[in-house]
A protein has these predicted regions:
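Aromatic-anchored glycine-rich loop motif in surface-exposed flexible loops
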Residues: 1-79, 92-107
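An aromatic- and glycine-enriched ligand-binding surface/loop that stacks and positions planar moieties
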Residues: 61-62, 78-185
Length: 185
């Protein structure tokens, strides 16, 4: 039961993350929260942005209930309570800043005071701290380090497909190597 609830929470976190990207890029997107079981249902109408933002908030607040309060490293790179609450804050700031509205997470209003509570908890109670030397953030030893609330893990061992186009490569850590400050990575 614990595995199922945690896995469902991780799926809700990822759905919220993906919808956050979609709604920022395209604004009106089809909002699907259940599997499509019939081909006639494939043509879904676009949802207004506020409806999508509210679903994102609902997914994140529900996910927070079943995600562990561990660091990314201790949780094997999976979503955590901390990453969901930080993501909710980011979503709120975008929605409030761009649309001027609060979020509604299934009947619970998410406003600035609630977000402040989550951020204070991350800063004061979370297992996070700044790395003393900024340049050390980019070192392999600090992957999923004390500054990491949410991080996508990559491997430098990924094999390239032989293509010279980045579009067709398994990039691994190459972006970090290309774009990190010189002499750091």
């Amino acid at each position: 039961a614990e595995f199922k609830s945690r896995t469902t929470a991780e799926a809700k976190f990822l759905r919220a993350l993906y919808y956050f990207h979609l709604v920022r890029w395209f604004e009106n997107v089809p909002l699907m929260t259940a599997p499509l079981t019939n081909p006639s249902a494939y043509n879904q109408p676009q949802a207004p942005p506020q409806e999508t933002f509210d679903q994102i908030a609902k997914d994140l607040t529900e996910a927070m209930q079943d995600l562990p309060k561990r660091t990314m490293k201790a949780n094997g790179g999976h979503a955590t309570y901390w990453s969901a609450s930080a993501m909710l804050a980011r979503v709120y700031l975008f929605c409030k800043g761009y649309y001027g509205t609060d979020l509604n997470a299934g009947g619970t209003v998410i406003d600035a005071a609630k977000i402040r509570t989550y951020l204070d908890e991350i800063i004061n109670s979370g297992p996070f701290s700044l790395v003393p030397v900024y340049a050390d953030i980019w070192k392999k030893a600090n992957e999923m380090g004390t500054e990491s609330v949410w991080e996508v893990s990559h491997s430098s061992l990924a094999l390239l497909s032989g293509s010279t186009s980045n579009q067709h490569q398994a990039q691994g850590n190459y972006n970090v190597l290309y774009f990190a400050p010189r002499g750091i990575a």
